[in-house]
Amino acid sequence: HGVIMLGLTGLFDETLQKPVKASLVTIFKSYGEALCHKKLFIFAACVGLVSVFSYCFAAAAPFIAQNILHLNAADYGYWNILNMVGMFCGAIVASRLIKKYESVQILLAAITIIILGFIVMGLFSVTGTLTTIGFFGITAIAYFVSSWIFPTASHIASNAVDCKANASGAMNFINMGSAVLMVAIMGYLPFEALWGFIGVVLVFAVLCFIGVVTIFLKSNLKLEIYFQ
């Protein structure tokens, strides 16, 4: 599929102001530059947070449902409807939020909600008060705000460099790569499925939050210096 797509690139017009010759050396160099771009990397990782949460949930939730919540397959399927409802409603709300607030503000709010949600899930687990509605309620909220993260983070990441194609390719690589890596790490952690799920998503979300805040503060500092 990739070879076919590469072969068809000659059919498209050049969109860059300074045309760049299509060659393997140029392609790898451009992808390398895109992957090393801090802003693109951080916001692509935020897109990856959505995949990390979704993939880790898909891997861990069946074990959590069976061993901790004591649900059968049918009940697990019914409770999963909450997640689909959360995702659907989140997409509707996201379209309205984007019109009123800055993308970074929406992104930080969504990541903060995920962090707080997983902290609460951990507290429920420690105190032995984690219920089915508590677990799926928190994951439904996480799916709800994940619908805010994807459009805002992907928009910022794809516009971080001049070449949108390279930005998109690098973003998707970071997105899927982070998801695969975190699922693999979760599988090797010496904890039960619930704590592996909480730990991996929580740590990744905190790292994304720190990265976005760092970029945001640096950009504000540059603006202040410029206006002075």
Outline where the language-model segments fall.
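C-terminal membrane-cytosol helix-exit motif in multi-pass small-molecule transporters
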Residues: 1-18, 212-215
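Juxtamembrane intracellular "pre-TM" segments in multi-pass secondary transporters
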Residues: 13-44
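Pair of pore-lining "gating" transmembrane helices in MFS-fold secondary transporters
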Residues: 36-56, 140
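Short amphipathic helix-loop junctions that connect adjacent transmembrane helices
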Residues: 60-74
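Helix-to-loop junctions at the C-terminal end of transmembrane segments
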Residues: 90-104, 190
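C-terminal transmembrane helical hairpin of 12-TM major facilitator-type secondary transporters
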Residues: 105-152
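A late C-terminal transmembrane helix in Major Facilitator Superfamily
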Residues: 144, 153-193, 200-204
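Intrinsic disorder in cytosolic terminal tails and internal cytosolic loops
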Residues: 215-228
